[in-house]
């Protein structure tokens, strides 16, 4: 049998085998897993270097606004041209847009001539409106004067310029089709103005194609996966106040309230949590139905500002919202049925939570402590999100390769129609940028797991002090045990925490990569049809999920033993696993039911955050003008995820209290031949009743 745990309490030997010390968990420790601490520090240095690349090369405006024919980002100031006011991208030549929509067309929409405007032009009922190129050369107009003239200086053109304009080669182009602001690009409406078209034909202009293709070509470009991804990332940047309030302050407030309620109304909290969880889940589902357009008239729309109510444009974002609405419906049904199934076990969870509530009452600093990792995570997320926006927009603006004969346009500086280097510009992403983005995402997950693990270890050390002092005088508990536990963690065990969080992050990353490969093969139709390969495919997915869940569970218990014993991560994992296996009959259902209630509590906080996120995003600020989000989907999911992380930090007070007391109970029983000397009476009663149930179920 394994000997006594090192340095659990004064009467045990310390981890290095030295003589016992006086007091509770006062022991001589050694620095553990130093190699992984060095790796973690190197990782942080790499994160800073990686982020500095993004800050140096990126421009988040690229995620929202398009490029003009010179490669300038609309809505920003450039060396030779100030486009700060001009945020809308407009395609000057409707025939180029039409040709880009043809299956056998040589011209791509990215090479069609575009400029940046203040608003989308509209055709006139009694005359022909023009939109002219940026004033240059002989056109002696300032940009502000050009804007005030509604981009029209046709009257100043020479006969040569007018002739090239009638050939749709500029510098002025007719406004034949109405257009609407769709995600900061003027999308043509394939309904030509009869009056404008008649004036154009009377002036001798070339034939202009009228077809739905002119509408679909732009729409296809706006709904491409790359464009949708850019808009989703841009939504995070636009909704940063929502993330601060609903992803930070709201879950912080709700988590503290939940802990206080657990402290004073523990008997009612499991019931309140289950009922509230189902109500919130249904409420969030209803909001998704509203945004999907299945309830009311508030569906997600890509159109910005006022527009013709009879004109509708549907983006890919609406499809995504509807998909999530269906998923939430399924989850709600499963959640309600599961809640009904666990009603009989809620009383057992109440008993376990009462033990945790007593710990919180005795060590009151535990309620306040999670605010420290919360503040550190908040600072990290602010830096991380800002860096992510710059990394996602850090591609190089390069000119496309195209057939120059299709993009000829009048050059005001050269005073002639120019077909050289008239292709459009695109943002080119190199492979190293993709690697940098994935490294940044992995870094976020590892850092989050590290902060959560550190918080859990500190809480475990504090609760262990409480447990082992029950058989002795209360002065034996060190003053402010939370800070004593923090000191031990910072001095000896940061490497062990870094290793545990790295293992979880690595397994989760592998699962993510395999899932991405699965989706890609599914789309391309390369998934094998043979039943054996399909079975192997789904079995591997299930195994990875099981491995992930097991590792997270083992890690949590390892952090407890790290806090108690000061041993390395692997040794602590082995000790914790041995203790649990030896006492599985006594602690089996108790721990599971307690975890279920706490998990539902975290979901309550995160769903509240998502609900508040929906309400904030439904305000005028995020439905119109510059801050309009393409869809509430990603900001709401971000609020949900941040709310869950904040709740995890605070709920770890209860979660780790239960787990630490149970593991301490197991060790206490082992050290005292099956009779725990320091266990609270309520815990003994709960565990003994659970053991009787397990024995009865095995014998019948």
UniProtKB/Swiss-Prot annotation:
Membrane topology (Extracellular): 55-241, 286-322, 386-432, 515-595, 655-700
Tissues expressed in: Expressed in both roots and shoots.
Any GO BP annotation: lipid homeostasis
Pfam families linked to this entry: Choline_transpo (PF04515)
Main location: membrane
One Gene Ontology cellular component: symplast
Keyword DNA-binding part of the UniProt annotation: no
Keyword Transferase among UniProt keywords: no
Membrane protein topology class: Multi-pass membrane protein
Name used for this protein in its record: Choline transporter protein 1
UniProt source species: Arabidopsis thaliana (Mouse-ear cress)
Taxonomic lineage of the native organism: Eukaryota, Viridiplantae, Streptophyta, Embryophyta, Tracheophyta
